[in-house]
Amino acid sequence: MNLWIDGRQVEAVPGERLLDAVRRLGLDHPELSRRPLAARIAGETFTLNYVPQREEQEDPAAMRRAMEASGGRITLLRYADSRGRQVYTRTVQFVLFLAIRQLYPGAVAKMNFTVGQTLNVTVEKEPAFTPGDVPALKERVAQLVEMDIPLLRKRITTQEAMAAFAAGGQVDQARLLSWRKTPYFDVYTYGDYMDYFYGEMAPSTGYLSVWDLVSDGGTGVQFCFPDSGNPDRVCQYRELPNFSAVFAESERWCHLMGCSTVADLNDLVQQGRLSELIRVNEALHERSFSQIADQILQREAKAVLLAGPSSSGKTTSANRLAVQLRVRGKQPVLISLDDYYRDRDTIAPGPDGKLDLEHINTIDTDLFRQHLSALLQGQRVQLPRFDFLTGRRTDTGKTLELDGDAIIIVEGLHGLNPVLLPKDVEKHLIFRMYVSALLPLNLDNHNRIPT
């Protein structure tokens, strides 16, 4: 059987792993930036521990079909590839949770949110986990990496997996598997520890060559991943207290509502309590906008600039905020940054020949600054409107002038960009906010759902 690994031909040896073939070709490297972490075969991700040439009855059908479909063509995945980073992350999870289990056998560790290129993991134990525990945990992780433990996946029945997870104190994973219809489940083990992270991992723990572990200042740690620009060095942890506080508050509410994992959500649905969960969340959402409206009035702001990624709910949030401001006797006026797009035929295409409509240069920032400055000074402006069918901006004839109770709400992708603000504007007149759809719900304590 011939294989083409990254375009180089090699003959598969019966019983030999992909990793061995990679090494025979001289494609393995000590530097993380060049080191293969996994392989892509016919669009699927495979571990480098996979054996292409083996007895047919031992070869899982999906893997065999992928090899046949690819014609033996294999692409290696490195850290620069998004799938390669996912493989690295799963390997990190296994090693970190194994280290926590070994140091604190009765502890409950939970994977939470990411801050930049770092991952937050909290540890619930008695006595409470503190920053003073971080050096010992870091040392244990380093030991597990140094041991270069092979990470081999094995298949067991779903019932066996449920029993093993429950016996090991991982009740959340056992509960999630109770909803699984497939009679088997794939796991990774080391000693009496068993886990799974819904995808392939690196061949061994020694592949975690670039990392750091720092305290989050409370009952957890921030795992620092390789720098995305240079994977051969660890990223710098930058504290974002407001960002972290929002995630922590969301997770606290999930806990209070008894809905921290997918198994919790399934139970609520089964108990007929889903509508109650939705109502409570809607009330919480309204309370958040009410508190924001109070902050706007306390600051005596006259313009709210609301930003967020595509489909994050910017328009919905702007309307909800407007309602709360009306309740407080104000007259909110909604303006969309989309109406300040430049005419499409005046926008230069990017290097790929396509228009990047998410770039700030597609917005007529000069006109927006003029209008915002004039409105804040009590002057009247004529509002534009962008016609997405024609790709051109038109004059609507609609004018706007703010009275004493008026507050502008501007929503758009670039709402936080300082280039939108007039140079002479007083800072207290501008209130900026960012909205995004957070999902603090985990599959289980060790597997988050990224957003």
PLM regions and their residue ranges:
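Ubiquitin-like/PB1-type beta-grasp interaction modules and other compact soluble beta-rich domains
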Residues: M1-Q93, L98, Y104-V115, E126, ...
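Hydrophobic positions on the alpha1 helix immediately C-terminal to the Walker A/P-loop
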Residues: S317-L321
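Conserved lysine of the Walker
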Residues: K314
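ATP-dependent NMP and nucleoside kinases share a basic, alpha-helical "lid"
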Residues: V410-T451
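Conserved nucleotide-sensing/catalytic segment adjacent to the nucleotide-binding pocket
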Residues: V333, R342, T346-G391
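Hydrophobic anchor at the beta1->P-loop junction of P-loop NTPases
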Residues: V304-L306
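Auxiliary tRNA-acceptor-end handling modules of aminoacyl-tRNA synthetases
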Residues: L37, P60, R64-V87, A99, ...
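Post-Walker A helix-loop "phosphate-sensing" segment adjacent to the P-loop in P-loop NTPases
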Residues: V323-V333
